[in-house]
Curated annotation (Swiss-Prot):
GO terms for biological process: translation. It comes from the Bacteria. Transmembrane segments: none annotated. Belongs to the bacterial ribosomal protein bL34 family. One of its GO terms (molecular function) is structural constituent of ribosome. This is Large ribosomal subunit protein bL34. It comes from Mesoplasma florum (strain ATCC 33453 / NBRC 100688 / NCTC 11704 / L1) (Acholeplasma florum).
Length: 44
């Protein structure tokens, strides 16, 4: 059986990347929350 996680940097960035986050209101909220928390890494 094929495993469910077949990593692809492009796919990952398109869904979870910075530009993907900034494209929606809720995504911007995520970035804001992560900045407030002091995360070193904001997005994937």
């Amino acid at each position: 059986m094929k495993r469910t996680w077949q990593p692809s940097k492009i796919k990952h960035a398109r869904v979870h990347g910075f530009r993907a986050r900034m494209a929606t209101k809720n995504g911007r909220k995520v970035i804001k929350a992560r900045r407030a928390k002091g995360r070193a890494k904001l997005t994937a």
